[in-house]
Amino acid sequence: MTAVISLPDPPQRASRGPRVAGPGQDRLGKRLRRQVGQAIADFGMIEAGDKVMVCLSGGKDSYTLLDLLLQLQKRAPVPFELVAVNLDQKQPGFPEHVLPEYLAALGVPYQIIEQDTYSVVSRVIPEGRTMCSLCSRLRRGALYNHAKAHGFTRIALGHHCDDMVATLFMNLFHHAKLAAMPPKLLSDDGQHVVIRPLAYVREHDIAEYAQARRFPIIPCTLCGSQESLQRRQVGLMLKQWDQDHPGRIEQIARAMADVRPAQLADATLFDFRALGHSGHAAHADAWLADAVPETPAD
């Protein structure tokens, strides 16, 4: 059962919003606003009249996303609407009061979706196994349904540069494909445009910004599930690279925007068969060993 609590004009609560910026935080904030604004411009993430659903989990990434979008909204070249949306999955111990109080104090329109996906995942996934994959699918479905029902034209997620690079290596190492996490995508059913405005922002900058702003962070370990061993290994690898070779993560991120099909091996992206003097090539089957007749012995 799904319940939606919609509070477009939140009442005043005895809670505080983000901390007022100091000099150092203001410099970081300017850099992050510039990076987010650049990503929005580069990929056409937000257009005039868009109604943007900002998915807020209570983690540092989504808090930072909402905070920066609210700041950019005041000076954006086009008008757009922002609504914070949280999916309450009924995890045991989830502090349901935190987000409503924070958003009410901030004066931000918000909606809370109440859907008990935790019980579903707990029933289906054996104890000790990671719940993240199924939980993610159920969460995505709930958010897509909500976006459709309430007329949202954009769904904004808090994935950042490090997430995109990690996904690239997850696909490379474990799925034998060069694919990552796009800054903007159309959902499989063609009904939703998903945007990731933090695509150019590094995770360590988000962590510093969130700490300086004193966001009321909600732990992501309430469900007792942990990230997969594979993703944890990739994360440790990237963290080590970042320490040993500063700038490497940014270089990898830039490489994802400079793909050269002619220097890879995907024949669906580049016509290798057309290269040569005549532009003609025998069919692949003709080169298979079992397709070439043996020459009879004399």
Swiss-Prot record:
What is one term from the GO cellular component aspect held by the record?
cytoplasm
Q: How does it assemble?
A: Homodimer.
Q: Which residues bind [4Fe-4S] cluster?
A: 132, 135, 223
Q: A single Gene Ontology molecular function, please?
A: sulfurtransferase activity
Q: Which InterPro entries match?
A: Rossmann-like_a/b/a_fold (IPR014729), TilS/TtcA_N (IPR011063), tRNA_Cyd_32_2_STrfase (IPR012089), tRNA_thiolation_TtcA_Ctu1 (IPR035107)
Name the family the entry cites: Belongs to the TtcA family.
Query: What are the subcellular locations of this protein?
Result: Cytoplasm
Q: Which reaction does it catalyse?
A: cytidine(32) in tRNA + S-sulfanyl-L-cysteinyl-[cysteine desulfurase] + AH2 + ATP = 2-thiocytidine(32) in tRNA + L-cysteinyl-[cysteine desulfurase] + A + AMP + diphosphate + H(+)
Per its UniProt record, what Pfam families does this chain match? ATP_bind_3
- Protein name, entry field: tRNA-cytidine(32) 2-sulfurtransferase
Q: Where is this region: Disordered?
A: 1-26
What is noted besides the main data?
The thiolation reaction likely consists of two steps: a first activation step by ATP to form an adenylated intermediate of the target base of tRNA, and a second nucleophilic substitution step of the sulfur (S) atom supplied by the hydrosulfide attached to the Fe-S cluster.
- Biological process according to GO: tRNA thio-modification
* EC numbers, comma separated: 2.8.1.-
Q: Where is this motif: PP-loop motif?
A: 57-62
Tell me its cofactors. Mg(2+); [4Fe-4S] cluster
Which keywords annotate this record?
A: 4Fe-4S, ATP-binding, Cytoplasm, Iron, Iron-sulfur, Magnesium, Metal-binding, Nucleotide-binding, RNA-binding, Transferase, tRNA processing, tRNA-binding
Respond yes or no to whether keyword tRNA processing is given for this record: yes
Cofactor stoichiometry and binding remark: Binds 1 [4Fe-4S] cluster per subunit. The cluster is chelated by three Cys residues, the fourth Fe has a free coordination site that may bind a sulfur atom transferred from the persulfide of IscS.
Task: Give the protein's biological function.
Answer: Catalyzes the ATP-dependent 2-thiolation of cytidine in position 32 of tRNA, to form 2-thiocytidine (s(2)C32). The sulfur atoms are provided by the cysteine/cysteine desulfurase (IscS) system.
Pathway involvement of the protein, from the record = tRNA modification
